[in-house]
């Protein structure tokens, strides 16, 4: 009797070959999916990697704000919180901006339909009534499947979805969210965090000289 071979015999049946081909295809597809996910995560890894649209319909790369601290806010013109928030936002922008800090305002009509106007009307109202000097972008959606990708990044980062107008996210110079505030929280509660980030930015610039 011949001794058994220490190596497994090659399987040459048609079914085995089909299985091997199918398994190879599944494996390759899986690897491609993983690589694609890694690429997408790298591309959208911070707030400043996105593009948005301004009130005049022009594309704006948020990368222009990289290196600054940004307070991102969903604004509305006809909300009980409108006046107090617009005034406090402009106050913060005047105090800490524009070199190291900026407010980024995104009108949204998803809360109480309190922002029904056109982009032109919204921007004009903000400048006329509250003297805003910070950017007011085009009206967006921040909830649901049609949410603006840049805003979805803020929500995903904090696991906190805005429940009303004037929800605020503080973004650091690298595009990561460091804190958020609800509409009823005053500028006084926001100021220390903004001041701290701005100090860090100034100190880093001095060190890099």
UniProtKB/Swiss-Prot annotation:
The way this protein sits in the membrane is described as: Single-pass membrane protein
The record ties this protein, via SUPFAM superfamilies, to: Thioredoxin-like (SSF52833)
Catalysis: reaction(s): 2 glutathione + H2O2 = glutathione disulfide + 2 H2O
Alphabetically sorted, this entry's keywords are:
Membrane, Oxidoreductase, Peroxidase, Transmembrane, Transmembrane helix
* One GO cellular component term noted in the UniProt record for this chain: membrane
Under Enzyme Commission nomenclature, its number is: 1.11.1.9
Transmembrane portions of the chain:
18-40
The protein's matches in InterPro entries, at most eight in alphabetical order, are given as: Glut_perox_Gpx7, Glutathione_peroxidase, GPX_CS, Thioredoxin-like_sf, Thioredoxin_domain
Instruction: Specify whether Zinc-finger is a keyword of the entry.
Output: no
Q: Where in the cell is it found?
A: Membrane
Q: Which GO terms describe its biological process?
A: response to oxidative stress
GO MF: glutathione peroxidase activity; peroxidase activity
Pfam families (UniProt xref)? GSHPx (PF00255)
The annotated active site, in chain numbering, is 79
Q: What class of enzyme is it?
A: oxidoreductase
Which cysteines bridge via disulfide bonds?
Answer: none
Q: Which PANTHER family match?
A: GLUTATHIONE PEROXIDASE, GLUTATHIONE PEROXIDASE 8-RELATED
Q: What family name appears in the similarity comment?
A: Belongs to the glutathione peroxidase family.
Task: Identify this protein by name.
Answer: Probable glutathione peroxidase 8-B
Output the lineage of the source organism: Eukaryota, Metazoa, Chordata, Craniata, Vertebrata
Quote the gene name from the UniProt entry.
gpx8-b
């Amino acid at each position: 009797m011949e001794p058994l071979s220490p190596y497994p015999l090659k399987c040459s049946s048609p079914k085995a070959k089909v299985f091997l081909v199918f398994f190879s295809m599944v494996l390759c597809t899986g690897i491609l999916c993983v690589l694609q996910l890694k690429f997408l995560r790298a591309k959208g890894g911070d707030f400043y990697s996105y593009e948005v649209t301004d009130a005049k319909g022009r594309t704006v790369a948020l990368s222009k704000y990289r290196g600054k601290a940004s307070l991102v806010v969903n604004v509305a013109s006809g909300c009980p919180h409108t006046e107090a928030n617009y005034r406090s936002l402009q106050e913060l922008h005047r105090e800490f901006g524009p070199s190291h800090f900026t407010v980024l305002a995104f009108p949204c009509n998803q809360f109480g339909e309190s922002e029904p106007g056109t982009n032109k009307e919204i921007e004009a109202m903000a400048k006329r009534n509250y003297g805003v000097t910070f950017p007011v972008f085009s009206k967006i959606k921040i909830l649901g499947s049609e949410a603006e990708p840049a805003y979805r990044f803020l929500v995903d980062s904090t696991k906190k979805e805005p429940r009303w107008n004037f929800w605020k996210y503080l973004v650091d110079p690298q595009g990561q969210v460091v804190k958020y505030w609800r509409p009823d929280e005053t500028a006084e509660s926001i100021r220390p965090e903004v001041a701290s980030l701005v100090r860090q930015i100034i100190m880093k610039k001095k060190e890099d000289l």
